[in-house]
């Protein structure tokens, strides 16, 4: 489980990225890099870290499911992820 402060920081960053997304896109298309540099650092989507939506774990993140391998395995065994079943060959 990640620290609550890290999870809160991620939520704040996501809100900031969403807030400035349109402005950032127009400035980038115009080539106005000076104005882009004036925007908050955390408004850049590159600075976001993929984290598990359940417990905030930053490593071993699976993009397709939005969770770490640990939570994925746990929920898959319980049958709580639609379309996922244990492989057998």
Curated annotation (Swiss-Prot):
GO BP terms: translation
GO CC terms: cytoplasm; small ribosomal subunit
GO MF terms held by the record: rRNA binding; structural constituent of ribosome
UniProt key word RNA-binding: yes
This protein's UniProt keywords: Ribonucleoprotein, Ribosomal protein, RNA-binding, rRNA-binding
Entry keyword annotation includes Nucleotidyltransferase: no
One Pfam family it belongs to: Ribosomal_S14
Summary of the function given for this chain in its UniProt record: Binds 16S rRNA, required for the assembly of 30S particles and may also be responsible for determining the conformation of the 16S rRNA at the A site.
Family of this protein: Belongs to the universal ribosomal protein uS14 family.
Subunit structure, interactors included: Part of the 30S ribosomal subunit. Contacts proteins S3 and S10.
PANTHER family listed in its UniProt record: 30S RIBOSOMAL PROTEIN S14 (PTHR19836), SMALL RIBOSOMAL SUBUNIT PROTEIN US14M (PTHR19836:SF19)
Protein name, UniProt field: Small ribosomal subunit protein uS14
Lineage: Bacteria, Bacillati, Bacillota, Bacilli, Lactobacillales
């Amino acid at each position: 489980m990640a620290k609550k402060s890290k999870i809160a920081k991620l939520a704040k960053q996501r809100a900031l990225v969403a807030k400035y997304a349109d402005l950032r896109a127009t400035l980038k298309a115009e080539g106005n890099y000076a104005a882009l540099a004036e925007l908050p650092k955390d408004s850049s989507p590159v600075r976001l870290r993929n984290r598990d939506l359940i417990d905030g774990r930053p490593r071993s993140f699976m993009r397709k499911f939005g969770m770490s391998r640990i939570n994925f395995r746990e929920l898959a065994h319980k049958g709580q992820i639609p379309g996922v079943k244990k492989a057998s060959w």
